[in-house]
Amino acid sequence: MTKQRRLAIKMWQEIVDKCKAGDDFYLADYKADFCKKHGLDWRANCYFCNYFDPCLKCPLDDKCGQVYCKVSTKHDVTSAEIILNALR
C-alpha cells in the first residue's frame, strides 16, 4: 500500500469520525488542510478527491471535493464510510 493511500485512509477515517461526532465542517477545507499538513496536493490525487477512483461513481452527491459540500448528515457519514472501505 502506498504512503498516499495510507494517508487517504487516515484522512477518510478522520472524516467519518468527525461526521459521527456531529461536527460541522466543510469537506473541501478539511481535505485541503489535511493534505497541506502532509505536503500533498489533494486535487492532484484521486484518493483525496471524492471521485477517488475514476471508475467509481462518486457517492457524495455527485459533488467534487472542490465544491464546498457540507458534511454533517447521516447520509454523508455513510458516503464517507463507503469511500473509506473502498480504499482499504
What is each of the regions a protein language model found here?
Residues 1-88:
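Cysteine-centered metal-binding/redox modules
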